[in-house]
Amino acid sequence: APAAPAGNTIPKKARVAMMTEKKHFELQEYDLPEVGDDDILVKVEGCGVCGTDAHEYKNDPFGLIPVVLGHEGTGEIVKMGKNVKVDSAGKPLKVGDKVVTCMIFKDDPDIEMFDLNKKNVGGADVYGLLPDDDIHLNGWFSDYILIREGSTVFNVSDLDLKSRVLIEPCAVLVHAVERAKTTGILRFNSRVVVQGCG
């Protein structure tokens, strides 16, 4: 599998901010996992803190502890599996590209992300909201994250870091507006109130 360019050596270990109990993180270090044929190893460059992260930190409503939070992240590809050629939109991927990711469709890795009907998303997971496992690099609150087969990943190399970190929150906004339109209550030029910011 392609590796990082000379001078950009990949360490053998990575640190994660592991939430080990409510309102408590521990900085833990783990060996970097092997990168499978369909996986991508990303060096984390930035991650936003979502309201969901705050809820998980305070109350663990999803029962995820221990967990590495962070789902509004972005970073640089440092290693790719041999089968990884393009992102979820068909744009070519290579070591050094900047990426974002969101869902993992573990039950059906071939689900069409752009299918507006979204018939089966019951088996979807989100990086940063995965219970800990033997990989450990499951959230963006870490040095590295392993993007696994069946994940949505997008090449956003043309954007600066601040813009890349805002992609996931903006996607949530667009999704919320699209869902609101399906209620039949909203019409073109409807006035709405946006309450809260997360």
Residue map of PLM features:
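Short N-terminal strand-loop motif that marks the start
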Residues: A1-T74, D143-I145
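An amphipathic alpha-helix/helix-turn recognition signal
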Residues: P11, K91, G96, E168-A171
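Short loop segments at secondary-structure junctions
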Residues: K22, V78-V84, E149-S151
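Glycine-rich beta-strand-centered segment in the early N-terminal region that forms part
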Residues: D31-C47, D60-M113, V156-L159
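Glycine-rich Rossmann-fold phosphate-binding loop(s) that bind the pyrophosphate
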Residues: M80, P169, Q195-G198
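Beta-strand segments within the central parallel beta-sheet cores of soluble alpha/beta enzyme folds
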Residues: V99, S190-G196
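NAD(P)H dinucleotide-binding glycine-rich loop of Rossmann-like/cofactor-binding domains
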Residues: F105-V192
